Amino acid sequence: TPQNIVIGGVAGSLPPVIGWAIATNSISLVSISLFLIIFFWTPSHFWELSLYKADDYKKAKIPMMPLTDGIEKTKLYILIYSLLMLPVIFLPYTIKFSGLVYLIPAMMLTIYYNFICYDLYKHKKNKFALKKAKKVFSYSIFYLFLIFVLFIVDNLI
């Protein structure tokens, strides 16, 4: 199924919940908010990868969205999932797990991520869109890393 990334995203998002449960002997809104950040980040991240590596997925006969549903639909879903990050990124602040040291830069990083995902979406020439997908993919790695660094910095201050 082309939704394999969403389904698999559950497993990929569980480590913070499991780690939190082991460390605190409970599951809390903190671990759930970390789960949701990773869960909503995962589809756009992997669909960006699948856009510029579509030939490899085709050779391996892995039914990634660009192959089953086309490039335009994949770009739309990348944009949708990046936009879903906006409310999710507020959760740690809302539950008082983090403060403004986290929230302000996290919002700036997320808005920029939305912008570049929109830029990818609006590119209709597939050749250029595939090159742009690689850049968006690279940023998405940096993005998630910085979000978690912001948690650490915010909680140390």
Regions found by a protein language model. Give the residues of each.
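Transmembrane alpha-helical segments that form the membrane-embedded catalytic/substrate-channel core
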Residues: 35-53, 109-120
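Hydrophobic residues within alpha-helical transmembrane segments
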Residues: 10, 36, 80-83, 142
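Transmembrane helix-loop-helix
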Residues: 1, 82-138
